[in-house]
């Protein structure tokens, strides 16, 4: 039996979480079933590159892929991954067929972890949807294979997009940008006084369209905003604190009792 690795969530906390758009796993599908009754379960994993070609997370910049079969998380919040099926392999295409030996795992629900290293030193981790393995004969005491909930979130580390982005990208109006990654202008601070007497639109209006059916991958995966190129100044407010009230009054002094005239009463009976 393969010795599986326990990946602790406490270690994952150190990884910077952000919107990760490089590996968009298209198969296996959620709930899909694969059988190992022939001696092994053969599964083709496919994915798309949903990032821009000029992005550091484009798969054109990928160095190696590590693919592991995982399950969980356990009641302690840990995921369980077997020894990698693919170890830091350079994959030219966007698919890889893996074989899972029949005697390595029991029947149950699993997902793939795809760990990608990039030329700039960055890394990403992606998880496929859960699928079901049947016809397996591996030991049942070590893996939590009954979990059917959501898989862990995608993760990325080592991509300082705010500093590596082309500064010219921030000068293009947002509505005119077309890439998966968009660039917003730097946030400005308000002035000390208002001098304008009329208002005007800073940018022209743009059309809005809505999806009529469920869409596939997002049109925009991430928006990058540059840091401030200035230092915001602040000052202490030396105004005295307002004193507590010195007079209280009962509510009855501010409430008057409702009255109705005799003529109004008679009119109500006649109506």
From Swiss-Prot:
Protein name (database record): Cell wall synthesis protein KRE9
Gene Ontology BP, a term: cell wall biogenesis
Compartments where located: Secreted, Cell wall
Family, per entry: Belongs to the KRE9/KNH1 family.
Signal peptide start-end: 1-21
Taxonomy, superkingdom: Eukaryota
Gene Ontology CC, one term: extracellular region
Chief location category: secreted
Keywords tagged on the record: Cell wall, Cell wall biogenesis/degradation, Glycoprotein, Secreted, Signal
Record function comment: Involved in cell wall beta(1->6) glucan synthesis.
Pfam family, one: Kre9_KNH1_C
Gene, per the UniProt record: KRE9
Modification after translation: O-glycosylated.
